[in-house]
Each structure stands twice: as structure tokens, then as C-alpha cells.
């Protein structure tokens, strides 16, 4: 039995190489595994399930094919695709997860998160996040015409890129104290998240015991995934995108 974790693919029409790598990953790595978790920022942008672009339909069909072979697929919102809804998940055969969620990873409780909520030093972003995730805000956004949402997504992306260029790297990384706080709040010793694009396995202490924080990598020059098996230690793996 094997479980795979990925995040931060940022799928978009302008990067067909990443889409192609993902489809190959599904065929070569995900087929036949027990579970596949996608922990946010699966798409570069998502403005509602009603958009239904050729890329989205292609990805949904590919996921459904994997699901139909017996692999359970779980999808968590990221900061760029938090408007993914149940309609897309139904087409893809995926189950939408809350952020955070604790799962049983072969006898070890694991706390799964996208990771943006851990970056508490970026106060401005956390205020923006709280506003955008408010159910009333989400309802208002989805009620607007599709063209308005498409324009808004482009504008927000441009604003985000401009603001991030002026921010210190430390602000955009997780706050160590917040990591410990979440581990202790959920009484677990293992956290898995994405968002920061800084793949690594960190050793720390929480609940008075050793703990680990595993950071998934973004898909750009490399394809990153975490592999967990019943009788093997977790392994953070990567291969050049060009190899897929």
C-alpha cells in the first residue's frame, strides 16, 4: 500500500509542460496506489466550477480515470484555487478536504495543510486570506459574471506578484511558532504541507516529543512528490520535469 502527496502544480494553459508531466505522473506513479493527496494550488487560478476550460476538463478526466482504478483522490484548497467546488470534485472523482485535516498515515496521524495559514508573519496576507475565505465573500465572488471573475483573477495575480517582490523571504515562509502551535493543537507529530515552494524535511519538537514537518515542492523545473508506504519510511522525491 502506498500513498502519494503533491502540491503547487499551478496548472495553467501557458505551461503545457507541467500539465503533460502531471498526466504522465498519474499514469506512471499514481495508478494503483491507495491514496493521492493534492494539497493546494493545484491550479494557478480558479474562479469557479462553471468556467470549465479544456485544461480543467482534461485534468478532471485524467483524475477520474485514476479514481476508477481504485485510487482514492483527495483535494485541498490552496491560496490560488480556493474556489474549487464540489462540482469539479465530482467530475474528477475527488474528495474535497478541509484545511487543516488529520489523516491516518499507516498508523501515524498526519496533519495536512496547504501551508499559507502558517505564514503568520505576513500580516497583510493573513488579513486578505481571512476576507477571501469568508463564506459571504465566496458567495459574492461566485455570483458575479464569469468575465468579471476572469478579470479580477488577472488583477489579483498582478497585485500579488508586485507585493511579493518587495517582501522579505522570511515573511513568506512559515512561522516556526505557528507550526508547533498547530501540531500541539491537533496532538500530532507529523505535518505535511506545501505553499512555500521550499521542499524539505524539518525535525523539531512539539508536544514534548520529536516531530517532523515535511514541505512539498512546487512543480516548475522539477516534479516533486512525497511517497509513504506501510512498511517504508516516507520519502520526499523529485525528478526533472523534462523526464516526464
UniProtKB/Swiss-Prot annotation:
InterPro entries: Calcineurin-like_PHP_ApaH, LpxH-like, Metallo-depent_PP-like, UDP-diacylglucosamine_Hdrlase
Record pathway: Glycolipid biosynthesis; lipid IV(A) biosynthesis; lipid IV(A) from (3R)-3-hydroxytetradecanoyl-[acyl-carrier-protein] and UDP-N-acetyl-alpha-D-glucosamine: step 4/6
GO biological process terms on file: lipid A biosynthetic process
Cofactor list: Mn(2+)
Enzyme Commission identifier(s): 3.6.1.54
Co-factor binding comment: Binds 2 Mn(2+) ions per subunit in a binuclear metal center.
Any one GO molecular function term: manganese ion binding
Membrane topology reported for the UniProt record: Peripheral membrane protein
Enzyme class: hydrolase
GO CC field: cytoplasm; extrinsic component of plasma membrane
Location in or out of the cell: Cell inner membrane
Binding of substrate, residues: 79-80, 122, 160, 164, 167, 195
Catalytic activity: UDP-2-N,3-O-bis[(3R)-3-hydroxytetradecanoyl]-alpha-D-glucosamine + H2O = 2-N,3-O-bis[(3R)-3-hydroxytetradecanoyl]-alpha-D-glucosaminyl 1-phosphate + UMP + 2 H(+)
UniProt keyword annotations, A-Z: Cell inner membrane, Cell membrane, Hydrolase, Lipid A biosynthesis, Lipid biosynthesis, Lipid metabolism, Manganese, Membrane, Metal-binding
Binding site for Mn(2+) 2: 41, 79, 114, 195
Positions bound to Mn(2+) 1: 8, 10, 41, 197
Pfam families registered for this protein in UniProt: Metallophos
Similarity remark: Belongs to the LpxH family.
Known function: Hydrolyzes the pyrophosphate bond of UDP-2,3-diacylglucosamine to yield 2,3-diacylglucosamine 1-phosphate (lipid X) and UMP by catalyzing the attack of water at the alpha-P atom. Involved in the biosynthesis of lipid A, a phosphorylated glycolipid that anchors the lipopolysaccharide to the outer membrane of the cell.
Protein name per UniProt: UDP-2,3-diacylglucosamine hydrolase
Native source species: Marinobacter nauticus (strain ATCC 700491 / DSM 11845 / VT8)
